[in-house]
From Swiss-Prot:
Role description: Decarboxylase; part of the gene cluster that mediates the biosynthesis of the tetrahydroxanthone dimer secalonic acid D. The pathway begins with the synthesis of atrochrysone thioester by the polyketide synthase AacuL. The atrochrysone carboxyl ACP thioesterase AacuM then breaks the thioester bond and releases the atrochrysone carboxylic acid from AacuL. Atrochrysone carboxylic acid is decarboxylated by the decarboxylase AacuI, and oxidized by the anthrone oxygenase AacuG to yield emodin. Emodin is then reduced to emodin hydroquinone by a yet unidentified oxidoreductase.
The species this protein was found in: Aspergillus aculeatus (strain ATCC 16872 / CBS 172.66 / WB 5094)
Gene name of the encoded protein: AacuI
A Pfam match: EthD
Reaction equation(s) it catalyzes: atrochrysone carboxylate + H(+) = atrochrysone + CO2
Gene3D superfamilies hit by this protein: 3.30.70.100
Enzyme Commission number(s): 4.1.1.-
Name of the protein: Decarboxylase AacuI
Known pathway: Secondary metabolite biosynthesis
Amino acid sequence: MSLPIPPRPADNSTSHSLCLTICGYRRPGMSEFDYRQHMTQVSAPMTADLMVKYGVKRWTMIHNTTESRALMDQLIDPQMANIADFDCFSQMVLHDLADYKRLKEDPWYREHLVGDHEKFADTRRSMMTIGWVTEIVRDGQVV
């Protein structure tokens, strides 16, 4: 049984987009360097045109390395004391969930990308979530 897509936020804005966030872990035994290299130099080039074909508005990767996580020591306070241990956040901004569903049904995706994910990702531990994007600041300006 498929759940209905929740409505857009109640402010009646048509500018809201969905953001699919994959909270990723690298494959066990893979170095941080090799994980990032595979995602940015192998997987991304194979995926980017397909994302454009199916209407993805933006796709970003945030790699959380040992070095970048060490910066958290400067930010920890009583309210923000729990540090996420994910290796990467991959975010896709979509106008419509159906676009992403069509992308995953594309024969090229199934043939090339499903297997590629197993080469770098711990797909059993990785998680995902989706939510509405509300932009507050863009390019240093309040929107």
